[in-house]
Amino acid sequence: MANTVFCKKFQKEMEALDRAPLPGAKGQEILQNVSKQAWQEWQHLQTMLINEKQLNLMQSESRKYVMEQMDKFFNNEATDKLAGYVDPDDIKEL
């Protein structure tokens, strides 16, 4: 049986990550408090934010922005919206 964690994003016991996704204390915090599903959803949003806002992760401001958005996402706070993005689940067939 897979390891589980109480996910702070979904507020329930869910499948845990296999290993810390980031180095250091932040990675351990995520490993102990974020489910595999929440991490995958964050990676999807992170990719969209980086692409839409044309972030250069070599710049400290961009890395700081991404980390702030990640914290907001996992704490169920509002994250920045992407201009013109429509969730595929919201599209109704014509």
Swiss-Prot record:
Q: What is this protein called?
A: Probable Fe(2+)-trafficking protein
One Gene Ontology molecular-function label: iron ion binding
GO CC entries: cytosol
Looking at the keywords, is Repeat present?
no
Return the Pfam families for the record.
Answer: Iron_traffic
State the similarity comment. Belongs to the Fe(2+)-trafficking protein family.
The protein's role, per its UniProt record: Could be a mediator in iron transactions between iron acquisition and iron-requiring processes, such as synthesis and/or repair of Fe-S clusters in biosynthetic enzymes.
Query: Keywords for this entry?
Result: Iron
Q: Which PANTHER family match?
A: FE(2+)-TRAFFICKING PROTEIN-RELATED (PTHR36965:SF1)
Q: Which organism is this protein's natural source?
A: Marinomonas sp. (strain MWYL1)
